[in-house]
Amino acid sequence: MRVEYSKTAVKALQRMDKPLRNHIRKAIEGLTLTPPKGDIKPLEGKPAGRYRLRVGGYRVIYRYGDDGSMVILYIIDIGPRGDIYK
């Protein structure tokens, strides 16, 4: 499985301090396992197929994709719980 980050997610990670960034990256690695590990829930509404991963007070918004030969984990956004859903 390949992991791809959106520009928004990369910027969010760059703004975080190193311990938090490492904690979130470790949680994202858990999503590549079968079955995925973590506090995961599907997001309601559109577009469908998006999920959220809870990492302390932060949320990781992601979806799975497929390029024909490999499953891709797209990290869409990362942010504090209060701001990420806006």
Range-by-range predicted roles:
Residues 8-10, 46:
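Short strand-loop junctions, especially beta-strand C-caps/beta-turns
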Residues 2-3, 7-8, 19-22, 55-58, ...:
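Enriched for short, Lys/Arg-rich terminal
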Residues 15:
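Small, basic N-terminal interaction modules of short regulatory proteins
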Residues 29-52:
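A short, surface-exposed loop/turn module that caps and links secondary-structure elements
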Residues 11, 38, 82:
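Glycine-centered loop/turn positions within well-structured domains
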